[in-house]
Amino acid sequence: MRGQVLEVGAGIGSNTPYLATRAVRDWTSVEPDRALARRIAECAARRELPFIWKVVAGTIDALDPAARFQTILYIDVLEHIADHRSELSRAALHLSAGGNLVVLAPAHQFLFSPFDASIGHYRRYSRASLIALTPPGCRLSSCFMLDAAGFFASLANRVLLRASRPRAGQIAFWDKVLVPVSCILDRLTGYNLGKSVVAVWTRSSRTGV
């Protein structure tokens, strides 16, 4: 990533320090929950980062219509939005020519569980269903799966354990064991199997916008 970056649904801003590269000039975090937006602002004030970190309390509609970004991120956010097609279309209007729109979302509708519903998920995605949301003026650059080990853990939880939500021990196991294993499995499977699906679109032109 480089230049100006927008993250929609930034939560508490935990992604920013890990994803931002030296090429990033400024990072805008959009978060509709005002309490969380305040936490991001507090975090931004504490950290010494080599770029400007801005916070917008609201949705993408709160942005200046003229604002343009070279990268727009939706990390585990799109599944929370009822009208996801309209959301991505509005996001694409804020892309610079040649800019990238990146979506990471939970995969496989058959894994949809009471836990998904309890945290406000409307759906999970397949490659096809995510690609079908390609916004006007954008072309699909890539679409792939992530977290192969997590897929099998989620399947076991759904079919065997039938747990409504993950326990603290399961989350710790996921972070410490499954994530490193997935880094290996994802490469071995050619990024064709995973708990999450990622799509990247590129803005082809600003003509007609």
Question: Which residues fall in each region the model found?
Answer:
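S-adenosyl-L-methionine-dependent methyltransferase catalytic module, highlighting the catalytic core
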Residues: 10, 14, 60-61, 82-93, ...
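Conserved SAM-binding loop
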Residues: 3-113, 199-201
